[in-house]
Amino acid sequence: MWLQLLLLLLAPQGGHGCHGLELDRELVLAKVRALFLDALGPPPVTGEGGDPGVRRLHRRHAVGGFMRRGSEPEDQDVSQAILFPAAGASCGDEPDAGEAEEGLFTYVFQPSQHTRSRQVTSAQLWFHTGLDRQETAAANSSEPLLGLLVLTSGGPMPVPMSLGQAPPRWAVLHLATSAFPLLTHPVLALLLRCPLCSCSTRPEATPFLVAHTRAKPPSGGERARRSTPPLPWPWSPAALRLLQRPPEEPAAHADCHRAALNISFQELGWDRWIVHPPSFIFYYCHGGCGLSPPQDLPLPVPGVPPTPVQPLSLVPGAQPCCAALPGTMRPLHVRTTSDGGYSFKYEMVPNLLTQHCACI
């Protein structure tokens, strides 16, 4: 009696078995809800509708800062990055009046790893000139108003660009395609020449760089691997028998095994409470504990009675049950918010994911 009670206490709560052949999804979800509420407590309620706020955490936990939606094709994986200068020209730090009259402005940009790892499709530099349209037209009639250089190890080099439409007192410099590789460097130092422009320290006049990127196409080797047709099935008597075998009966998967179910927190109604991960694979034990012999045992010999195979049982005389082996459960780490996304908390749900199942 005491041994049976000890077994029940040691059996993990997340790996309950002894279910029939068909396990209802709602039953699994109800069990998962109970496990989460037991570990984390009830979700916070701050609004009338029971939601902890409307601010959501952007799904940017992938490498590079962005996560692509699984339903979007690869050619639709586009993004836009706005870069502000890490160090710009300061009107109070200019060495002499000659440089100020020359109208040379230096801006240093630091593209992120995400931007450098992608293919740039367009790039524009927005610069506040402080000139109205008439002054801009008069300056362009005599000589180019703006010039763009990049600082390299060999000295300043011109950057091919063209002027586009811009709001009043602003200029938009569209970088040519040949200049897109500049955004793949960790540091980008641009020299902008504008003799008629005045230096401004106002925050709203800060220049910025806009880059549109998309995922790089696969390399030649990877493309070749994707386009290579699969090898034909090698013919053999065993392969022929495998192809000609009848379909398996549902009872073939009725034995004790580890089952999996993809559960999203939106389905549980907790997507505004548990913000990461958005979903997880829930493993649990399922199936019966019949007396079918293992596949590695020898076939029965005619005239010799077969030896009955008993499942593993920790309690003699007890009915075996498909359950997780004690001590083999793994936790799930989640990120939660109680104020709508203004602060986050890392929490853990222990003994949730089943690793090994057995009839015990």
UniProtKB/Swiss-Prot annotation:
Gene3D superfamilies named among the record's database cross-references: Cystine-knot cytokines (2.10.90.10)
GO molecular function: cytokine activity; growth factor activity; hormone activity
Signal peptide bounds: 1-17
Residues annotated as site: Cleavage: 60-61, 226-227
GO cellular component, one term: inhibin A complex
PTM field: Proteolytic processing yields a number of bioactive forms, consisting either solely of the mature alpha chain, of the most N-terminal propeptide linked through a disulfide bond to the mature alpha chain, or of the entire proprotein.
Residues listed as glycosylation sites in the UniProt record: 140, 262
Keyword tags: Cleavage on pair of basic residues, Disulfide bond, Glycoprotein, Growth factor, Hormone, Secreted, Signal
InterPro entries hit by this protein: Cystine-knot_cytokine, Inhibin_asu, TGF-b_C, TGF-beta-rel, TGFb_CS
Location in or out of the cell: Secreted
Main location: secreted
GO biological process: hemoglobin biosynthetic process; regulation of cell cycle; regulation of cell population proliferation
Propeptide: 18-60, 61-226
Disulfide partners: 256-322, 285-357, 289-359
Function according to Swiss-Prot or TrEMBL: Inhibins and activins inhibit and activate, respectively, the secretion of follitropin by the pituitary gland. Inhibins/activins are involved in regulating a number of diverse functions such as hypothalamic and pituitary hormone secretion, gonadal hormone secretion, germ cell development and maturation, erythroid differentiation, insulin secretion, nerve cell survival, embryonic axial development or bone growth, depending on their subunit composition. Inhibins appear to oppose the functions of activins. Inhibin A is a dimer of alpha/INHA and beta-A/INHBA that functions as a feedback regulator in the hypothalamic-pituitary-gonadal (HPG) axis. Inhibits the secretion of FSH from the anterior pituitary gland by acting on pituitary gonadotrope cells. Antagonizes activin A by binding to the proteoglycan, betaglycan, and forming a stable complex with and, thereby, sequestering type II activin receptors while excluding type I receptor.
Subunit-structure text: Dimeric, linked by one or more disulfide bonds. Activin B is a dimer of alpha and beta-B. Inhibin A is a dimer of alpha and beta-A. Inhibin B is a dimer of alpha and beta-B. Interacts with TGFBR3L; this interaction regulates female fertility.
Family note: Belongs to the TGF-beta family.
Protein name according to UniProt: Inhibin alpha chain
Organism: Bos taurus (Bovine)
